[in-house]
Curated annotation (Swiss-Prot):
It comes from Bifidobacterium longum (strain NCC 2705). Alpha-maltose 1-phosphate binds at K343, Q403, D438, N474, K612, Y613. Transmembrane segments: none annotated. It catalyses: alpha-maltose 1-phosphate + [(1->4)-alpha-D-glucosyl](n) = [(1->4)-alpha-D-glucosyl](n+2) + phosphate. The record marks D559 as: Transition state stabilizer. HAMAP family: GlgE. Keywords: Carbohydrate metabolism, Glycosyltransferase, Transferase. This is Alpha-1,4-glucan:maltose-1-phosphate maltosyltransferase. Residues 10-32 have a biased composition (Low complexity). One of its GO terms (molecular function) is hexosyltransferase activity.
């Protein structure tokens, strides 16, 4: 149903004009000797009923639920999403469409309606939308709403102050109300059809329409009120047939007024449901990762040795990320790397003289987490990198791995921050049978307040340098309360800062991390490759979990190279990119993906010659021969052009007839797109990187808000080709031609 606009309306009395018209018509009737019919207005019908001692049914009174658990005149309950444990509000990005549902009902056969009202942090109503009953048997009502308007403005850009004012705690209230018109219409149609107590039924309808016209908070225009008054007069006219009288109140014009400006009796608002509305890029984001030491790295022609890149040469990586349409550049730790127990190539225990070590073995005599590795440059170089990123419209996300090499300054300054063995030595990190001899884990039981204070100091330092996002390495191996305190302290001073959790762990821990402030998270998408796996996983990511845990889809990372990506070549890389970009509002690419770097280290699901342990020299001119960079660019362009890609709450899996063809749709109604036009994307992917497949794709047009009376004109956003679609549609996709369709409904 269309949005219901409610505003107080000062009505100019039309009594004199109405009376004049009635008298004129009565006079005209008296002039005709053949007829002595009497025409009555709705007011006359009501007065006549009162003189006969009849009770016209009173409208339901409005009763508010002033306390939690209290019911109003209309029952409203089981609202979703609800505040988790009554403490943690659901989280959405500014302008992100999301679904509200509730059970709304009343005693007996009376029909009800429901409306969702959105209010900003200052209590101002910003949206009011009628809900739709999707399951009458369970009294379940639903509607899509949004908090504020979507924006692409970055924290440093002009105009961001206006965005910032919209962030914070919003509320959505569900109002249940008695739908007197629909209740009357249901019974009146039956009574007229069987000619049972027709006059009472139609006079009741005339009274109802007249009351509807007089009600001040319906948002009716003067013209609308005239329409209802005239309909009431016609319905009360006993000179007309019962069918004609009923038609006065049962027609498309009255139905349209009911859709947009209904008569709402017994309005019963629920308790407001809180939502935490976060800044742009908290949900809808495109990430790009590269290692600064590999950007601009070259091979010395005289010695054959690698000359590593620096923060200055990393400007090329920024240019590439921006050209491909990404929003965020994610850098691994840029801090000094320890020497003691430094790892060699492919995570070997002994490093060679030219091995740079892992940037996750943090800290040396040159400094710790608050220092730039001199091999990369200086803090001024880092600030210049951030400044250039901002000029390109990119945010900088810095990896913050809270662990230390044996050479970290903390080891001497704060030995109590580390676990000690009985022999007095510090225990290195272990996850049996894996051992990380170059890393000392932190012991949070010794001095958590002291560690929190130091981490807050360091994060503030990098924020001042230009960082707007922290990607936290393995946050699930640290206390949740620690992160709760740190994130609260950092965002109190810098509310624009976002946190991503690199946490592959149990659902409970991932949910807890989202509660305490991690706006996005890595997830198990890389291992969801079959049709069955994806049909199960996509609705989970884009369902109720999406109100708290914003999964970011990465096809690969420095630590993850699955068999699917290894075995399916260019087509497989394109398939996984399409699934990542269209399957989640947040997705990311680790550089080298454009060059089909898909050789696994034997026995491990990671790349051989892992960039974590060495500098990689890449020839980016070869990227053109694969076409993957063009695919990444196209995907980001499509995402930015289509509001349907913005939300974690609008994905529907579509039935297909082939086990290798996956299809899903994203739909955002016109009222929520910001363009005034509905936006629907239909994504169809061939999961087989070696063979062509054909399939029928079924669309439930009405459920997707699409027209059912004519063919749909759809455009493939990847190729520009156009097709006509309907309920059932044939597709053929091949890895050497089109691996996917991304169809936009025109």
């Amino acid at each position: 149903m269309a949005a219901v606009q409610h505003r107080a309306t000062t009505r100019t009395s039309n009594t004199d004009n109405s009376t004049t018209k009635t008298k004129s018509k009565a006079t005209s009737a008296r002039k005709s000797p053949a007829t002595k019919r009497k025409r009555v207005s709705a007011e006359t019908a009501r007065a006549a009923a009162a003189l006969k001692g009849l009770a016209v049914e009173a409208p339901a009174p409005s009763i508010e639920a002033n306390e939690p658990g209290q019911f109003g005149r209309i029952n409203v309950m089981d609202i979703t999403p609800a505040e988790e444990r009554g403490i943690f509000p659901a989280r959405v990005e500014l302008g992100e469409p999301f679904e509200m549902t509730a059970q709304v009902f009343i005693e007996g056969r009376t029909k009800v309606g429901a409306t969702a009202i959105v209010r900003n942090p200052r209590g101002k109503e910003t949206m009011r939308r009628a809900m739709t009953c999707v399951n009458p048997g369970l009294d379940r009502w639903t509607v899509m709403v949004k908090c504020g308007e979507h924006s692409d403005l970055k924290p440093w850009e002009d105009g961001y102050a206006a965005v910032k004012r919209q962030l914070g705690e919003w509320t959505v209230t569900i109002e249940g109300w008695e739908d007197a018109y629909v209740s009357w219409l249901h019974d009146a149609r039956i009574k007229v059809r069987v000619m049972d107590d027709v006059d009472n039924a139609l006079n009741s309808g005339a009274e109802l329409l007249a009351r509807w016209a007089e009600t001040p908070d319906t948002g009716l225009t003067a013209r609308d009120r005239k329409t209802l008054e005239k309909a009431a007069e016609t319905m009360a006219d006993q000179t007309l047939s019962a069918e004609d009288r009923l038609a006065a109140g049962d027609n498309p014009t009255i139905a349209a007024l009911h859709e947009t400006h209904p008569l709402r009796d017994g309005i019963s608002p629920s308790q407001p449901q809180r939502f935490k509305v976060e800044r742009p890029k908290s949900s809808f984001a495109a990430w790009y990762q590269f290692f600064p030491r590999s950007e601009g790295a070259t091979i010395d022609p005289n010695t054959g040795k690698i000359i590593q890149g620096t923060l200055k040469t990393s400007m090329a990586g920024l240019e590439r990320a921006a050209a491909e349409g990404f929003d965020i550049v994610y850098l691994p730790p840029v801090f000094p790397i320890g020497v003691t127990n430094r790892k060699g190539r492919n995570n070997t225990l002994v490093a060679g003289p030219d091995d740079p070590g892992s940037p996750f073995g943090i800290g040396s005599e040159l400094g710790g987490h608050d220092t730039v590795d001199p091999l990369l440059g200086t803090m001024d170089d880092f600030k210049a990198l951030c400044q250039r990123a901002h000029e390109l419209g990119l945010e900088i996300a810095l990896d913050f791995a809270l662990q230390c090499s044996p050479d970290h300054p903390w080891v001497k300054a704060h030995p109590n921050w580390f676990r000690h063995k009985p022999d007095g030595s510090i225990a290195f990190a272990e996850n049996p049978p894996k051992k990380y001899q170059d890393i000392y884990p932190i012991d949070f039981n010794a001095d958590m307040p002291g560690i929190e204070k130091e981490v807050e100091r360091i994060m503030n330092l990098w924020i001042e340098a230009g960082v707007t996002i922290f990607r936290i390495d393995n946050p699930h191996t640290k206390p949740v309360r620690f992160w709760q305190d740190v994130i609260a302290a950092v965002t109190k001073k810098h509310p624009e800062i976002l946190f991503l959790a690199e946490a592959f762990t149990r659902p409970g821990m991932m949910r807890a991390l989202s509660y305490v402030g991690f706006t996005q998270s890595h997830c198990y998408f890389p291992w969801r490759n079959t049709k069955d796996e994806l049909e199960e996983y996509l609705p989970v990511t884009n369902g109720d979990d999406g109100y708290y845990q914003h999964n970011t889809f990465w096809p690969t990372t420095p630590d993850i190279l699955t068999a699917y990506v290894r075995d399916n070549g260019v087509a497989g890389h394109c398939v996984r990119a399409v699934l990542a970009a269209m399957g989640s509002p947040s997705w990311g690419i680790y550089n080298g993906y454009e060059l089909i770097e898909n050789k696994q280290r034997p026995g491990f699901e990671e790349q051989i010659d892992n960039e974590k342990y060495e500098v990689k020299v890449r020839d980016w001119s070869k990227a053109k021969q694969y076409g993957v960079a063009e695919m990444l660019t196209a995907l980001n362009k499509i995402r930015r052009a289509h509001p349907a890609a913005l939300s974690y709450h609008n994905l529907t899996v579509l039935p297909t007839s082939d086990p290798n063809i996956l299809a899903f749709a994203r739909h955002t109604p016109a009222e929520l797109t910001g363009t005034g036009q509905a936006d629907t994307l239909i994504v169809v992917v061939n999961l087989d990187g070696h063979n062509a497949h054909q399939s029928m794709i079924h669309l439930e047009l009405s459920e997707l808000g699409l027209p059912t009376d004519r063919p749909l004109n759809v455009r493939d956003e990847l190729t520009g080709r156009e097709f006509q679609w309907g309920w059932d549609n044939y597709v053929s996709l091949a890895p050497w031609a089109d691996v996917a369709h991304i169809l936009s409904v025109q």
